[in-house]
Amino acid sequence: QEGDAAKGEKEFNKCKACHMVQAPDGTDIVKGGKTGPNLYGVVGRKIASEEGFKYGDGILEVAEKNPDLVWTEADLIEYVTDPKPWLVEKTGDSAAKTKMTFKLGKNQADVVAFLAQNSPDAGAEAAPAEDAAD
């Protein structure tokens, strides 16, 4: 399911109470809270790897058990829909807990498309290859 980044930027208003999107040079793409990690570059980034952010045990366990796992658009869509089942699936631990209690009930693909647009490492995962027909 392809998302609409422009719609996702508007929908991100629900996320900015806890998250910002700030470029490495300090430019605020979306000013937001610091309860959650900065989401600039999240697509293609290793799980729970935002420098200086204090992650919860559940997401740290995902990173520990899956050291090469990076956020894909598909995983982010699943995660923002309901973080707990995603954590349980990735850790194999039914008691896994999340610090992110918010659940995004609709327009997840749009929000993730917006995040991918602000993720330089999203690479091929985020953009369909258009050169194949040449």
Swiss-Prot record:
SUPFAM superfamilies: Cytochrome c
Molecular function terms from GO: electron transfer activity; heme binding; metal ion binding
Modification after translation: Binds 1 heme c group covalently per subunit.
Record InterPro entries: Cyt_c-like_dom (IPR009056), Cyt_c-like_dom_sf (IPR036909), Cyt_c_1A/1B (IPR002327)
Residues where Pyrrolidone carboxylic acid is found: 1
Chain sites annotated for binding heme c: 15, 18-19, 100
Official protein name in the record: Cytochrome c-550
Keywords tagged on the record: Electron transport, Heme, Iron, Metal-binding, Pyrrolidone carboxylic acid, Transport
Job of this protein: Electron donor for nitrous-oxide reductase.
Organism whose genome encodes this protein: Paracoccus pantotrophus (Thiosphaera pantotropha)
